[in-house]
From Swiss-Prot:
Cofactor: FAD
Record-listed E.C. numbers: 2.1.1.74
Record's catalysed reaction(s): uridine(54) in tRNA + (6R)-5,10-methylene-5,6,7,8-tetrahydrofolate + NADH + H(+) = 5-methyluridine(54) in tRNA + (6S)-5,6,7,8-tetrahydrofolate + NAD(+); uridine(54) in tRNA + (6R)-5,10-methylene-5,6,7,8-tetrahydrofolate + NADPH + H(+) = 5-methyluridine(54) in tRNA + (6S)-5,6,7,8-tetrahydrofolate + NADP(+)
BP terms from Gene Ontology: tRNA methylation; tRNA wobble uridine modification
Function, as annotated: Catalyzes the folate-dependent formation of 5-methyl-uridine at position 54 (M-5-U54) in all tRNAs.
Gene: trmFO
Protein name stated in the entry: Methylenetetrahydrofolate--tRNA-(uracil-5-)-methyltransferase TrmFO
PANTHER family hit by this protein: GLUCOSE INHIBITED DIVISION PROTEIN A (PTHR11806), METHYLENETETRAHYDROFOLATE--TRNA-(URACIL-5-)-METHYLTRANSFERASE TRMFO (PTHR11806:SF2)
Family statement drawn from the similarity comment of this UniProt entry: Belongs to the MnmG family. TrmFO subfamily.
Origin species: Rhodopseudomonas palustris (strain BisB5)
GO CC annotations on file: cytosol
Binding site for FAD: G15, A16, G17, L18, A19, G20
Length: 477
């Protein structure tokens, strides 16, 4: 499908976050001109701090890079096979993070910005699109993300006659490494697991006793919160990005079974005593001078954050490079509004990508941007691209967005919700593995591992066939 055909009409892409940047790259790789519109720095958002493309506003983690055993790791592998700019920039700017792929956020954004700015077929325009695109833009990708500007959001709502749902997305605090007390904290990845660029000792761990944990939970619940704006009230949270104080309010033990779970970690300062809970910090930049507090997104006000988080053992004198925050996110009822090519049924010249479609996570957003870019490139030369097989991570995610969910439950509100990639979105195996390589019958966890590995192997094989048959390109190694 992809060929170096220069068309007179460019593809217009609105929004240069992860999805828009990846879409622009894929369209340009196909030989199609791109005009990439980004409103920053002329108009900033509540969460962005720079004018860089593909700025990471929350975590710096792309999560697991294990393609054989983890669905997001599989998505990484599929995107690499398709020449993803986001994955190339992530690989080039990785920082140690155990079994995860984490990046230096500034280096990552700079790499994406440089690649797009230097591409001869990509024009970057720093301007806000204050409403629906002009009618003479016949091939448009809207990838404006969770913080779509109000005029454009209202225009989309008016066009679709749908009230976009909204949820909160959260930012975790970042701590200066040299302010952490290493006589209390220690380096270790959970179960000593090493990952890309890592050593198996990539997280900083701060232990808590039962008494310290109980006091911390009380302080979280009692801490002063930032008041919601009128337009934020009654907005549901997305469970994958709950504020830590909301988790604490759901039950006293919630945190120690979530981001503060102590399993797989041993305190070398006191190896015979098991910690009741552990706070982990993950390296945030290549220099190793900044560490972010894993899972500590919050709506506490700045004063409460500093007071409460400095009760954590090892962080008594913590200096914060950035405190946490919370912002609203919006998404479409995509199964109803979008066709399998991610086009708006009410206006097929408009295609959507990224978090607005109902995918959740950096890599998922970029992955849907990748698919949108390939589809738009096909449209530009009068072709239609077959969707990636549903057995692949990209295809499974696309299926979730464009038709994998029930519209209503008992005539109530729609049930479509944002989703991270997971093996539950994949079609079942025709024959699930029952025996291991040694011929022994698989049981319990071994059976689950074998199933995930079989799903991943099937996905990569099917993606290679799709690349060869539909894109007419050799699959990357």
């Amino acid at each position: 499908m992809i060929s170096a055909v220069l068309t007179t009409q460019p593809v217009h892409i609105i929004g240069a976050g992860l999805a828009g940047s990846e879409a622009a790259w894929q369209v340009a790789r196909a030989g199609i001109r791109v005009v990439l519109h980004e409103m920053r720095p002329d108009r900033m958002t509540q969460a962005h701090k720079t004018d860089g493309l593909a700025e990471l506003v929350c975590s710096n983690s792309f999560r697991s890079d294990d393609a054989a055993n983890n669905a997001v790791g599989l998505l990484h592998a599929e995107m690499r096979k398709l020449g993803s700019l986001v994955m190339r920039a992530a690989d080039a700017n990785q920082v140690p993070a155990g079994g995860a792929l984490a990046v230096d956020r500034d280096g990552f954004s700079a790499a994406v910005t440089k690649a797009l700015a230097e591409h001869p077929l990509i024009e970057i325009r720093r301007e806000e699109i204050g409403g629906l695109p002009p009618e003479d833009w016949g091939n448009v990708i809207i990838a404006t993300g969770p913080l779509t500007s109000a005029p454009l959001a209202e225009a989309i709502r008016a066009l679709t006659d749908e009230s976009a749902l909204a949820f909160f997305d959260a930012i975790a605090p970042i701590v200066h490494r040299d302010s952490i007390d290493m006589s209390v904290a220690w380096f270790q990845s959970r179960y000593d697991k090493a990952g890309p660029g890592g050593s198996g000792a990539d997280y900083l761990n701060c232990p808590m006793t039962r008494e310290q944990y109980d006091g911390f939970v009380d302080a979280l619940i009692e801490g002063e919160k930032v008041d919601f704006k009128d337009w934020e009230r009654d907005t549901p949270y997305f469970d994958g990005c709950l504020p830590i104080e909301v988790m604490a309010e759901r039950g006293r033990e919630t945190l120690r079974h979530g981001p503060m779970k102590p399993v797989g970690l041993t305190n070398p300062h006191n190896p015979l005593v098991k910690s009741y809970a552990i706070v982990q910090l993950r390296q945030d930049n290549k220099l190793g001078t900044l560490f972010n507090m894993v899972g500590f997104q919050t709506k506490l006000n700045y004063g409460a954050q500093q007071r409460v988080f400095r009760t954590i053992p090892g962080l008594e004198n913590a200096e914060f490079a950035r405190l946490g925050g919370l912002h609203r996110n919006t998404f479409l009822n995509s199964p109803k509004l979008l066709d399998p090519q991610l086009r708006l049924r009410a206006a097929p010249r408009l295609r959507f990508a990224g978090q607005m479609t109902g995918c959740e996570g950096y890599v998922e957003s970029a992955g849907i941007g990748l698919v949108a870019g390939l589809c738009a490139a096909a449209d530009a030369i009068g072709q239609t691209l077959a969707a990636p097989p549903p057995t692949t991570a990209l295809g499974a995610l696309l299926g979730h967005i464009t038709g994998g969910h029930i519209e209503t439950i008992d005539a109530g509100p729609r049930s479509f919700q944002p989703m991270n990639i997971n093996f539950g979105l994949f079609p079942p195996l025709a024959t699930a593995p029952t025996h291991g390589p040694d011929g022994k019958k698989l049981r319990g966890p071994e059976k689950s591992v074998a199933k995930k590995q079989a799903l991943s192997a099937r996905a990569l094989a099917d993606l290679d066939r799709w690349i060869g048959d539909c894109l007419k390109l050799p699959a990357a190694a």
